[in-house]
Amino acid sequence: ILPHKATAKVDSRLPPGLDPDEALQKIRAFLDDQGYADIEIRKLGGYPASQTSVESPAVQAAISVFAKYASDINVQPRIAGSAPFYQFTERLGLPLVPTGMGFGTGAHAPNEIMLIEPGDDIAAAGLADIEKAYVDFVYALADAE
């Protein structure tokens, strides 16, 4: 027995420069071209991507500060998650540096964890060092501007 309908929720992470409405139009055009004009699309939300240059004084300040506290610095121009970061970078013209330092897992899950004090076998910062690093970052950012 086949159901009379099927539904799917699709989350698209857009690159900088691609407008959410334009992306939706491209998806609609692709489905139509493939013979799926009968598929209904309901837009539930959306916002533009955001990116701050790795050369930005804010990013360089974060890298220099976090290097004091963590042995492995991983710079990612974009993150896999989504948030309306464009409000800062596009509308306000401010650099945004989404950062994380230390060891954690299970983000946004009931079993999300963060280490208070990592063991010697973990090359990551614990809670106290993370707090110190964020204070140092604010000072480094003030000096960089």
Go through each PLM region and give its residues.
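A short beta-alpha structural unit
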Residues: 11-16, 40-55, 78-80
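Midchain, well-structured core segments that form catalytic/ion-binding scaffolds
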Residues: 1-18
